[in-house]
Amino acid sequence: MAENPNVDDLRAPLLAALGAADLALTTVNELVGNMRERAEETRIDTRSRVEESRARVAKLQEVLPEHLSELREKFTADELRKAAEGYLEAATNRYNELVERGEAALERLRSRPVFEDASARAEGYVDQAVELTQEALGTVASQTRAVGGRAAKLVGIELPKKAAAPARKAPAKKAPAKKAPAKKVTQK
């Protein structure tokens, strides 16, 4: 059988193209695997942080009455009120910082198209963490107010009635990041 020189001339470029396609496929598969690992790590990390927050809130609920009884013994009603206001302000400031940080982190995640699924799950976890934090903040505020009221009664001071809480403004939901259109390939 006579060999066709034209087939031999095309063999090397065709094999090179096949090798390049195989390399590209392998690289894409590795990238997808890495992205899946990172998404899973992020999900696990977020879940563990939520669980840690729940544990801290539970511990705070256990320890708070002890701390409040110690404070009741140490402080007068005015000192107790000032301390409670300081704690409430510090907790509110920290909470607001965490909200801002969470929003920034969510925007960074949303800006990466490969993490859209992971960011959607993370957003759910963030919402859960925010709800837990709000519950904890509400519990701390109500218990602090109750202790202040009891301390005032013990001392014989009448506290002003609790003003109606102003309506909280719900944080604006941000639209999901839009995908950039695919680049057009021009032939030369």
Swiss-Prot record:
Residues 170-188 have a biased composition (Basic residues). Residues 162-188 are annotated as: Disordered. Gene3D superfamilies: Apolipoprotein A-I (1.20.5.1230). Might mediate adherence to host cells by binding sulfated glycoconjugates. To M.tuberculosis HbhA. This is Heparin-binding hemagglutinin homolog. It comes from Mycobacterium leprae (strain TN). The gene is hbhA.
